[in-house]
Structure formats: C-alpha cells, structure tokens
C-alpha cells in the first residue's frame, strides 16, 4: 500500500510551480487532476483515499469507469477525467516508443506490443504496416473483441495495407488470459492472412500473440513461415 502524507503547507499547484512536477508525490499529482474535493474530503484526502485503494500505481489502469464511480467521492465526471488521463498517458507512451529504425526481429515488435496490449481486458488485433526498408508506416487497431465475437476476416487488414502502400505487415493480438499459447483458431487465422497477403503480393512477416509478460511468435515457433 502507498504511504500517504498530507502535511504539505503548500497546495499541489503551488508546489508544482515552485518545485517542478517531478518533485510532487503521486498523491499531489492526482490531486491536481481531481481539482476539487467534496463535502467529506479535501482534494488531498480524496487523492489519498483513491491511492490507498491500490497496491501499486499501475493498478489504477485496471479500474473500469463504473468501478471508479463506486469509490466514495469519485463521481461520474471525475471518473471520466481519470480514465481520459490514463488513456492519454498510454498514447503519449506509445508515441514516444514509435519505432523509427527498421524492424529487425519479432522480439523487437513483441516487446513494444506487450507494453501496449499487455493490460487490455479485451482481445485487440493490431496490424503493423512496413515499407520496403522495414520501417513502420502505420500501426492500426483493426479489431477489439468481445466474449461473443472473435477475430474473423483479414479483409480490413489488407485494406489498410493497400491504403498505406505497405510492402509487408505484422499482425499482433493479445490474450487477456495471460497465456500466449495459440489456439486452433489462431493457427487458422494465421494461415488465412498469410495466404491473402501472398495473393496480393504482400509479405506477412509474422503473427505475434502477446500478454503482459510473454509472447508467442508464429515465425519463431511454428512451421507456418
């Protein structure tokens, strides 16, 4: 659990101006984002309460909008603001990790995508489009799955490949269960997308399954490539 302190004489905004954002605690940073408290709790107490509900700061990402709203003092508006802040932070991190150099291995792509998709609670299918120098042209989320729906047709993957005039592509999806062992459907889909790419003169470099801590590369571990 976090150790929460509320003895600062200056309010978080004043401390940020005077000392810089890197000097503020997680509690103070969150208090700035929350902006105000409520009738029962000062904003610093509210941020302390929220952080005390976590084992680690990373757990904040796991709260759904509804779960945040169920916390005392966190209404709908504050819950929306927190979720938006977390999503923006993810996008900033992803943008900062954009691969400018050529993609040289499946492991390189897997490491990047484990960060991006490892915490997702639904299955995400992402296509990474590359030019003739193996540099990334675009990374596109093609599909977000539900319990009743699974990855089906490669049509949309190929549409964006043609739109980007890509030379090759890599398909990545996550297993929310944390287990990266491919299913029979994963094998079938890999064969299907590879055949479709061959038909259009595209190179399917790999299909990678990721979790938070592991990955499976069809190129590295199967005989499909």
From Swiss-Prot:
Q: Where on this chain is JAMM motif (motif)?
A: 173-186
What residue ranges are annotated as transmembrane? none
What family is this? Belongs to the UPF0758 family.
Against NCBIfam families, the record matches this protein to:
PRK00024.1 (NF000642), radc (TIGR00608)
Disulfide bonds listed in the record: none
Q: Check the record and name the InterPro entries matching this protein.
A: MPN, RadC_JAB, RuvA_2-like, UPF0758, UPF0758_CS, UPF0758_N
- Keywords of this protein's UniProt record, alphabetized? Hydrolase, Metal-binding, Metalloprotease, Protease, Zinc
Q: What name does this protein carry?
A: UPF0758 protein SEQ_1136
Query: Is Heme a UniProt keyword of this protein?
Result: no
Annotated GO MF terms: metal ion binding; metallopeptidase activity
The scientific name of the source species is: Streptococcus equi subsp. equi (strain 4047)
- One GO biological process term: proteolysis
Segments forming domain MPN? 102-224
Q: Where does Zn(2+) bind?
A: 173, 175, 186
Keyword check for Lipoprotein, yes or no: no
